[in-house]
Amino acid sequence: MATTLFIDADACPVTREALSIARKSKVSAVLVANATQNLARYAGRAGVEAIEVSGGRDAADFAIVERLSSGDVVVTQDIGLAAMVLGRGAAAITPRGRRYSATTIDMELAVRHAEQRHRRAGGRTKGPSAFEEEDRERFSAVLSSMLSESDPRA
């Protein structure tokens, strides 16, 4: 079973669902975000730790990776953070309920890099589709399954 659920809480649309699932699964949760996210609203909740970081744009990512152990689960939409998480022997899931995979993460990083280069050169790329209730439901089902598995990386 996962020891800890980390939530990259900068603009995470499923924080409430993730915390509820962690509580039901008896897994501790750690919210990590920059100071603009008002994590104080989670103070005092049993099984929830809120960590506010300051500094660069990747400060929350590095704070998560520093605390991560093999078998933990991270909720993030950041492909770079997901790659670091997988490299540390933990599991990662998007807010839309898609598990990141060690077999596809290199391709996802390459696509992200190519799109960044295209945008820097003045090109346009398609953004993500609107977040819908179906995404929220898929996330909840997949995260519940991951937290009940003996090895959430599977």
PLM feature segments, named:
Residues A2-A154:
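Nuclease catalytic cores that cleave nucleic-acid phosphodiester bonds
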